[in-house]
């Protein structure tokens, strides 16, 4: 695991000197404290910081192939590198190390850009191909490893694992995208390919990009190609028992291949279904007790430590845990530094702390991320199915009936009923997006006044429309994998673990497992009110019954309580500051109304208030010359 960065001349002009690349790499030392390496030509420069997990002594980067004409830096892990190495050795390639990175370099020399589809793992890759005079960038299928890029000055494109690598380039004057700010409040994150800065993007998952500089001021040749796609059809036709056996085998293999490591490792254990299954499968392949790490809260409705302890005891793990209290919100500045752009998921706090806990004992962990998207585990999938049943049963009259009921009922019940009516009146996929949005159009008007987006879902709507999938239910799974999973869950895990120089591997997002699970009939994912139907059948072979019936909690923190008590002074100081008011981003009367509604218990505004604090804290970290674009 590493962090990478680099520059390329787009039109043949000279690049900044080596000190610029060194400065870019220094910003991501936390991603790779063990080693640094760089390579320069007159038209391209690449660098890396390394966290040594495989071939600790011999895995220095950049790695080379084709007599040094190919130079590669890489962030991630490749789990099939040994099989790939055997194939390449049979074709005459001689290896100088036992690292997975050298396999990628030789695979590129042999297969070109076709090599990326051969890699089983997580990665962001940069290759300087001197024979073709091109830079090639690539990102893994699901987007576990990040890669930002953009033109930082005329004729110079920069890229890196984190936005802070680009901020280290002298002369770049970032400009805030106010469209992205509103997306942040609608969704809780900024969806790819956009970022908080205008002109800076993210290479989409499952894509590679080739950049060939132009000559003498000419235009560059830039090609972006998708090399991976998740197919939901045709569906498997095996009987349920056979599919259960196949799922067990895929899960077990996904865990097994991720246990290759030359350093100590463990696992996150929340006590929920996904992480418990991962830990149970890990113990099948280990001869020593597994190290597990859990986080909890004093507030009973949010605390999963008793559940995690029961699973740890059942599996015989060496268990470590800690409790998160309101003073953990003091981590906000640290989190903002590591996320680089506004990130609204408050579960970043416990994820950061459990990563910090784990990093005291191990250098790598397995996590349970991805199970909800793959097997329809979130409650919102059940809620959406319920909305569709209401719509069918009322022959389309439900929106009007719900709005009428909302007008007649007082307080929170009326607001909820009105909200249901509004969603029932929306077309696909806005009816689903409105269900999961953190801020609805009325909230956006409170936050931004007349400048609020007229179309809050425009940046993600098309991700939920796939003509090759014949049901809205599975278009939702596909869309969530392409948006929420990539830009919220995986961003959260990457930044919080890497901030602590800890590698996280997600076996439930193994490409083979995804390919298998996508083609399962949907009623083996969500059956009635039970999500993860077939996954639970497998889990029943590994875990106590109480884990299977436990209500899903997620990793949420008790923001509503905290903002009414311990965090209230911090909130009031933030929104009352002169800098906050002078920025002119928010409608001040609307912000005050949000605070009043929350403090008086009229509505839970905890998530929106948290995002207000995140954005303001992030704004205070920016260079003085940074300016926001006008809102449209």
Q: Where do the model's predicted regions map?
A:
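Cysteine-centered catalytic environments shared across enzyme families
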Residues: 1-339, 351, 355, 541, ...
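Adenosyl-5′-phosphate
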Residues: 1-4, 22-23, 168, 198-204, ...
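Short beta-alpha connecting loops at secondary-structure transitions
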Residues: 166, 294-295, 341, 385-393
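Glycine-rich loop motifs involved in handling phospho/adenylate chemistry
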Residues: 265-274, 299-300, 346-349, 374, ...
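Alpha-helix capping and helix-loop boundary segments enriched in small/acidic/polar residues
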Residues: 299, 323, 342-345, 392, ...
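Short secondary-structure boundary/capping segments
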Residues: 336-338, 379-386, 628-630
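Active-site adenylate/phosphate-handling loop in enzymes that bind or generate adenylated species
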Residues: 353-412, 484, 493-513
């Amino acid at each position: 695991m590493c962090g990478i960065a680099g520059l390329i001349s787009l039109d043949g002009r000279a690049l900044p000197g080596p000190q610029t690349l060194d400065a870019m790499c220094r910003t991501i030392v936390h991603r790779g404290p063990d080693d640094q390496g760089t390579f320069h030509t007159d038209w391209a420069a690449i660098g890396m910081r390394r966290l040594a997990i495989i071939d600790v002594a011999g895995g220095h980067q950049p790695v080379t192939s084709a007599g040094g004409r190919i130079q590669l830096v890489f962030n991630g892990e490749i789990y099939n590198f040994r099989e790939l190495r055997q194939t390449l050795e049979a074709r005459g390639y001689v290896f100088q190390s036992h690292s997975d990175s050298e396999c990628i370099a030789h695979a590129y020399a042999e297969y070109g850009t076709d090599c990326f589809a051969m890699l089983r793992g997580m990665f962001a890759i940069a290759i300087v191909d001197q024979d073709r005079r091109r830079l090639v960038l690539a990102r893994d299928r699901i987007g576990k490893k990040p890669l930002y890029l953009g033109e930082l000055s005329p004729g110079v494109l920069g890229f890196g694992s984190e936005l802070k690598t680009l901020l280290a380039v002298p002369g770049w004057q970032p400009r805030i995208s106010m469209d992205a700010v509103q997306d942040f409040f609608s969704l809780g994150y900024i969806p790819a390919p956009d970022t908080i800065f205008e002109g800076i993007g993210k290479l989409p998952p499952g894509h590679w990009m080739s950049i060939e500089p132009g000559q003498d001021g000419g235009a560059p040749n830039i090609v972006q190609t998708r090399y991976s796609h998740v197919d939901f059809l045709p569906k498997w036709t095996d009987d349920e028992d056979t599919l259960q056996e196949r799922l067990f085998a895929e899960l077990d293999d996904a865990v097994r291949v991720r246990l290759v490591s030359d350093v100590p490792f463990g696992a996150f254990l929340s006590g929920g279904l996904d992480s418990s299954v991962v830990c149970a499968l890990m113990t099948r392949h280990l001869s020593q007790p597994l190290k597990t790490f859990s986080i909890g809260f004093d507030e009973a409705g949010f605390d999963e430590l008793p559940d995690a302890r029961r699973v740890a005891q059942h599996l015989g793990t060496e268990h470590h845990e800690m409790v998160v209290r309101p003073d953990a919100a003091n981590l906000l500045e640290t989190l903002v530094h590591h996320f680089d752009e506004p990130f609204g998921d408050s579960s970043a706090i416990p994820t950061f702390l459990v990563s910090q806990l784990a990093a005291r004992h191990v250098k790598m962990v397995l996590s349970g991320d991805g199970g909800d998207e793959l097997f329809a585990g979130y409650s919102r999938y059940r809620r959406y199915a319920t909305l569709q049943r209401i719509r069918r049963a009322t022959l389309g009259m439900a929106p009007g009936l719900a709005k009428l009921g909302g007008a007649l009922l007082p307080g929170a019940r009326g607001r909820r009923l009105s909200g249901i009516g509004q969603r029932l009146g929306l077309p696909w996929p806005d009816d689903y997006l409105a269900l999961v949005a953190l801020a609805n159009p009325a909230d956006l008007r409170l936050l931004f006044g007349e400048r609020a987006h007229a179309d809050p879902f425009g940046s993600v709507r098309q991700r939920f429309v796939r003509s090759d999938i014949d049901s809205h239910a599975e278009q939702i799974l596909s869309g969530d994998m392409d948006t929420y999973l990539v830009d919220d869950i995986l961003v959260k895990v990457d930044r919080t673990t890497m901030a602590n120089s800890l590698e996280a591997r997600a076996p439930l997002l193994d490409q083979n497992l995804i390919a298998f699970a996508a083609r399962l009939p949907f009623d083996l994912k969500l059956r009635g009110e039970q999500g993860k139907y077939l996954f639970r059948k497998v889990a029943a072979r590994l875990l106590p019954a109480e884990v299977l019936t436990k209500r899903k909690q997620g990793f949420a923190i008790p923001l509503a309580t905290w903002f009414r008590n311990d965090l209230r002074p911090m909130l009031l100081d933030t929104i009352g500051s002169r800098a906050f008011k002078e920025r002119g981003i928010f409608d001040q009367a609307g912000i005050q109304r949000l605070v009043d509604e929350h403090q008086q218990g009229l509505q839970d505004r905890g998530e929106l208030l948290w995002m207000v604090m995140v954005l303001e804290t992030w704004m205070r970290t920016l260079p003085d010359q940074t300016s926001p674009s006008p809102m449209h």
